[in-house]
Amino acid sequence: MKNNYLNRLKSQWIWMLSAFMLFSGLSLAQTTTITGVVRSEGDMESIPGASVLVKGTTRGTTTNLDGEFSIQASPGDVLSISFIGYATQEVPILNQTSNIEVIMVSETSDLEEVVVVGYGSQLKKEITGSVQTVTGDDLADMPVSQITQKLQGRLAGVQINQTTGKPGQGMNVRIRGQLSVSAGSQPLYVVDGFPITGGINSINPDEIEDLTILKDAASTSLYGSRAANGVVLITTKKGKAGQTNVALNYYTGFQNVPHYNRLEMMDAVEFAQFKKESYEDAGQDVPVEFQNPSQYEGKTNDWYDALLQTAPISNYNLTITSNTDKMSTAVVAGFFDQKGVVLNTDYKRYSLRLNTDYKVSDKVRVGFNLAPSYVKDNTPRTDGDRGTGILFNALHTWPIMPIYDQNGELTYYNRLGAETGNIYAYPNYVRAAKEIINENTVTNVLTNGFVQYSPIEGLTLKSTINAEIRSEDYFWFNPSTASAGINQSIPTVAVSIRQGIRDFSWLNENLATYTRSFDDHNFDLLVGYTNQHFRREVTRVQADTYADDRLPTVQGGLNINRGGTNSGVGEWALTSLLSRINYNYKGKYIVSAAIRGDGSSRFGANNRWGVFPSISAGWVLSDEAFLMDAEKLSFAKVRASLGVTGNNNIGDYTQYALVNNTVNYVFNNNVVPGAAVSSLSNANLGWETTQQFDIGLD
């Protein structure tokens, strides 16, 4: 009896304690306004423009002209404050929520940091071009799918815009603005020395050790014909000195479209009243649908809200690194899963990376990297205005039109009488979001291997072979029961599209570097020869008129659409010679010169080769005797550069004549199929070049 009483008492205490913890947690989770000021160490001057971010979230702000900030956060959150030239400070939110003073400590030791540049590395202090580096630690704990999303607002002179709000969608990156009128404007992405062709959307951000942006011609000219829009160098994780390290990183959360700042839509009663008054004001008979607005009481259909959902997001990453005297290894495995805020929208990415480096002897090193990834997404056609995007069309659908019928089933379409002014048939866009398939899968494999030999002190010979294999499959199926457009009654003609893209790219690089110092003179020389080849095969089949929507295969369509069915092959090749020399005296007076020659199959026979030189110089003023005693000046360098870069994103066969095979001829008094040249060849087609002159003060 006593034991039963004790058990009941224990259960009551556990219940009360659980309830207390639950309500305590709820109260702690409430956000409040956090205010403070950011100052510099020593002079205690305020710092305007400092970045203030709630760690682990995308909530952030910047300090005003007086160094003050205001941000929404919860007790227990951590504020991460950063500014160029200062070490990042992390401030936990405890009891104090106002007038928080953050003191930024100057970060001068990074001048001796080694920074990755084109085809090598340099001391940050000795760089004469415009270069900015972001480390993986700076970008950690941000719940986004793409590395470029993490860079927004962090890089001077780099504009990053999201093309759509769909999960996993890529970003438009512009380095120092738009530099081309007709050719491509995206920067060149180089992953572990390999200029990739398939974009970086499939790369797991947690695989990245650091990222360097090359902005001016002095820093990009070694990439020649592809560097006019800037270069992004990505270095992935390697094994670090010490014992084996294992790290598991996981986060989860939810996303939704906030009600704040949404368009305020009429409810059904307000809409019917509005229509009734408009007819009365015009002196016209009021249609029966609007004569009694109160009949729609409690029957409002918010089409926009019906298309939205609370979307979970989760990310898992396992990182294993080890480093011994002989071998360095890093393994990163990741899984990212994000639902979209629109119904039937989702994005999944599976990724794996293996980086190994083995020291065969004091003179020989070999390495191998392998990075497969698999991405699958489904995204309803939400973009566009009237007739193309379901969100826009849903906003214009009358709230008196039902989403569900009396049996609780989704309606097919709505159309009122012409006297109501409703001249279009409105398909059920909720049904369209759920039933229309817009699926894309991408399998991508990046791999490279290298052999490095150092025959004498200061001389290094390195040969690499790189390959990228990419397979993309797209499937779109619009069943007869749904439509995303307007003025389309159901059933409609079912249509399917299947498209396959197969890419293969390889690159061979052979580089020699020689570094030498004597007295206070230091120089290094780089020479190299590279070859790259790319091939793409595309196959597309479009079918329609399906007897049964449950069989959306090509064979299930009664008609193969010839206009939407095609195939093609595209290839290009690039051969290059390159060289660079860096010289400095006492690390104070710095000169650098580089040149690259590119031969591309994309250009005319008379203009196939292009030459892209650059020269730059720097003077470290802070090392001069007349500035040694300047207490508030930790580092100062003036630099200037002049160079030429190119852009070869013009298509693979622009230099050739174009033949149109849809032209008809009259032969023997009969019209017969034929072909004709629709545009002439251009053997003098050449490079689009950009000349840049820069002066900077660091």
Regions found by a protein language model. Give the residues of each.
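Intrinsically disordered, low-complexity regulatory/activation regions of eukaryotic proteins
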Residues: 151, 488-489
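Flexible hinge/switch segments at interdomain interfaces of large molecular machines
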Residues: 121-127, 293-297, 422-426, 483-485, ...
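Extracellular/periplasmic, surface-exposed regions of secreted and cell-surface proteins
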Residues: 139, 185-186, 314, 349, ...
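Core alpha/beta catalytic barrel or barrel-like domain that forms the active/cofactor pocket
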Residues: 379, 482-484, 592
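Short, small/polar-rich motifs associated with maturation and membrane association
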Residues: 1-17, 23-353, 358-367, 371-373, ...
